[in-house]
Amino acid sequence: MIQEDYNMSENIIYCYSGSGHCLNMAKTIAEKLGDTDIVLMRSFPEKTDATEAKRVGFVFPCYGGGLPGHVEDYVKAIKIAPDAYKFAVEQFAGYMGCGLHKIDEIVDLDYSNLISNHSTCIWLMPHTLCVPPTSKENARARIDRKAMEVAAAAKAMKHSEKKPPKKAFFALEDKLFSQMHSKRVKKFWVNDDCIGCGTCVRVCPQGNIQLTEKRPSFGTNCIGCLSCVQYCPKQAINVGKITEKRERFPNPNVKAADLTKKIIHID
């Protein structure tokens, strides 16, 4: 049973998701663990006191070689019991980056894992350009298998043999990503297929999109989640020319409304 809930559960998974793939993975893990709160980190987490949780997990993607948005600051605000079991899993497109290492530095992970999802990075590396090439269906199947692996490890409280590597190059890229992205956000535009439904406004975690006469206008506070691009029902939103001919692939099990929730409880 899935519901919104604010009581303390046995397990908590903190999740950041832009195209729904990480949230779907978090749900799969939670269903296997049972009695789990999934706390969204698209904005400041609704629940930061995790001191009563037996297990605390983190599910997130790699953005620009590091953590997405303000996730690093959010994780620093979370209170975890000293004896809690802590795990994390990262999804990435071309390379793993240093996100797992950053989480480990903050919370001292007991277990970590990662999965390459070549079908998620619409503007950097679409799955048709990846080596080896893969389909959306195959990518999702791989993620589902990885979710089951992580869930089994977390349930058994398995410990990883090695800590996540720092990857100095990716740490440098992470610092430069915000500068590069600030130029990219100026290239958002909407074609004539837009119906003014406001989905983009609702899924933007930064409040960066406004509707003016039923047309979205974009501010400069974008963190690159691309939820607006992925979940537009008419595929009317683009970033420059690069996304025009690239297919969208939001997770079919995650609706736009799911991304706007603060906490999802799974029994």
Report the location of each language-model feature.
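FMN-binding flavodoxin-like domain, especially the glycine-rich phosphate-binding loop
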Residues: 2-12, 20-25, 31-46, 50-60, ...
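A charged, amphipathic alpha-helical module
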Residues: 162-170, 178-197, 207-212
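Iron-sulfur cluster-binding cysteine motifs and their immediate structural context
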Residues: 189-190, 195, 199-217, 223, ...
